Amino acid sequence: MARDYYGILGVDRNATESEIKKAYRKLARKYHPDVNPGEEAAEKFREASVAHEVLTDPDKRRIVDMGGDPMEQGGGAGAGGFGGGFGGSGGLGDIFDAFFGGGAGGSRGPRSRVQPGSDTLWRTSITLEEAYKGAKKDLTLDTAVLCTKCHGSGSASDKKPVTCGTCNGAGEIQEVQRSFLGNVMTSRPCHTCDGTGEIIPDPCTECAGDGRVRARRDIVANIPAGIQSGMRIRMAGQGEVGAGGGPAGDLYIEVMVRPHAIFTRDGDDLHASIKVPMFDAALGTELDVESLTGEEVKITIPAGTQPNDVITLDGEGMPKLRAEGHGNLMAHVDLFVPTDLDDRTRELLEEIRNHRSDNASVHREGGEESGFFDKLRNKFRK
């Protein structure tokens, strides 16, 4: 005869999953072996656990509503519940019995209640100047921290965890399901102890027995000089605290260097465009340019400098990360041609143009040869 799982929990057949769980928790608190010792209470606790398992599983509940019992022999049995064994269906089912031992085959055992914490990734952005000098960044993290009330134990008192009555400490519920191969055993984590095989009889009211709570935490991250965009800084033990007060994971800070208005970075080198008057480019000169640090750096412009020429200033680039030395500053020449000429300047420029008119043009329309390269090219054509 099928068991009355609804009657065991004291709920009607139309009860919601929330009502079923609420009724189960009420009975579990009443009949838990640590609270109510004795064989009769232990049996009622086991009955309530199995009823909860059945009625919170949609497939099993459907079988109950159709008048069946999913926990009868061959229909599945939870450790510590009513059923047990594979039953005798013969055929391929017996072969699976031989491999799985007719009971606890494939068991992984309970997992530890104390688990290591997860790593945390935090992204932050800095200026190019901060990447050059190094910086300290104040960060506020929303993370899992150790519960200060129970210090990670999860218990509100000195009582130690007790063996879970649902799975008898196995940490998992084993079930037998029918398939075209016969009876196949499956297992899943125990819903009562969450797979740990033990429960806390008096859970901490602050963390609900988890040993950790969510909180905001302030930390200071040291950004080393020379860091590049996309690099990560590892801060050991600064991630999330694990369940049961387990060791914290690591914190990884991913750094993004914001674009600069003047300088462009390429590895350890810096690139910048400098405006050079055409007179200085022709005659050569020395100019003072401002570096990334704000200091004046002297740059030599050779005579005859052309547009887009690159002048290298050794050691004026970014510091090398965790190494000696700096990269270079690559100054790209942007030739500046004045547009508002006074009469004297215009007169001098015209004089220069007339003086160099014999070789200033590289190409002249008409049949007349325009320079040395034209003459050389025409020689090869003959």
UniProtKB/Swiss-Prot annotation:
Span of domain J: 4-68
Cofactor, how bound (note): Binds 2 Zn(2+) ions per monomer.
Alphabetized InterPro entries for the sequence: DnaJ (IPR012724), DnaJ_C (IPR002939), DnaJ_domain (IPR001623), HSP40/DnaJ_pept-bd (IPR008971), HSP_DnaJ_Cys-rich_dom (IPR001305), HSP_DnaJ_Cys-rich_dom_sf (IPR036410), J_dom_sf (IPR036869)
Reported cofactor(s): Zn(2+)
Gene Ontology cellular-component terms listed: cytoplasm
Protein keywords: Chaperone, Cytoplasm, DNA replication, Metal-binding, Repeat, Stress response, Zinc, Zinc-finger
Similarity-based family: Belongs to the DnaJ family.
PANTHER family linked: CHAPERONE PROTEIN DNAJ, DNAJ HOMOLOG 1, MITOCHONDRIAL-RELATED
Record protein name field: Chaperone protein DnaJ 1
Encoding gene, per UniProt annotation: dnaJ1
